[in-house]
From Swiss-Prot:
The chain crosses the membrane at residues 11-31, 87-107, 116-136, 158-178. The lineage of its organism: Bacteria, Pseudomonadati, Pseudomonadota, Alphaproteobacteria, Hyphomicrobiales. GO terms for molecular function: acyl-phosphate glycerol-3-phosphate acyltransferase activity. Keywords: Cell inner membrane, Cell membrane, Lipid biosynthesis, Lipid metabolism, Membrane, Phospholipid biosynthesis, Phospholipid metabolism, Transferase, Transmembrane, Transmembrane helix. Probably interacts with PlsX. PANTHER family: GLYCEROL-3-PHOSPHATE ACYLTRANSFERASE-RELATED, INNER MEMBRANE PROTEIN YGIH. This is Glycerol-3-phosphate acyltransferase.
Length: 202
């Protein structure tokens, strides 16, 4: 039995379910409704993530959404990590899938950047620092938030592999692929030169 499976299938499945249950909580939708702003899915991109919440003009609400979406990746991983590395990775996968495909919203969720960050914080804070450096550097230089996130996410499994975290690297290879898939519209706009830049009005 490999170390990742040492906890046994019941623990892995329980961790996956725990992660999904946390990840599927649509904080962006909940917070905007509680704030009296209606359904965030009816504005902007229709996404439930922090970037679209920011389009309501409420920066504090967007920041709260970002924090909550990150924590729903961090907390289940830390909890499941008490059972071993395998359950921690399963919880991370579950949280990310829950955010992208929440059952409560017809499996139409966010794009996953905040939850990606949250899972990474729990599993490799050092790699998160590298992710942040790449994201901030590219965002500052090119003014494309989506491109910065895509590049940082693609670099993440490579960095993890270089640090000797093979199992975590494999997980983030899957997460990065899903994140890129969810960003397909952004990628098309980047290719066409129509993607909005950071700070751009209208």
């Amino acid at each position: 039995m490999t170390p990742l499976l040492a906890a046994g299938w019941p623990a892995l499945i329980a961790a996956l379910v725990l992660g999904y249950a946390c990840g599927a909580i649509p904080f962006g939708l909940i917070l905007t409704k509680v704030a009296g702003l209606g359904d965030v899915r009816t504005i902007g991109s229709g996404n439930i993530g922090a970037t679209n919440v920011l389009r309501t003009g409420r920066k504090g609400l967007a920041a709260a959404t970002l924090l909550c979406d990150a924590l729903k990746g961090t907390l289940p991983v830390l909890a499941a990590g008490q059972w071993g590395e395998g359950p921690a990775l399963a919880a991370g996968l579950g949280a990310f899938l829950g955010h992208l495909f929440p059952v409560w919203l017809g499996f139409k969720g966010g794009k996953g950047v905040a939850t990606f960050i949250g899972v990474l914080l729990a599993l490799s804070p050092l790699t998160l620092a590298a992710f942040a450096a790449i994201w901030l550097g590219l965002a500052f230089a090119l003014k494309y938030s989506s491109l910065a996130a895509l590049a940082a996410s693609a670099a993440t499994p490579v960095i993890l592999w270089a640090l000797g975290h093979g199992g975590v690297a494999a997980l983030f290879l899957v997460l990065a692929a899903l994140l890129w898939w969810k960003h397909a519209p952004n990628i098309r706009r980047l290719a066409a030169g129509t993607e909005g830049r950071i700070g751009q009005k209208g």
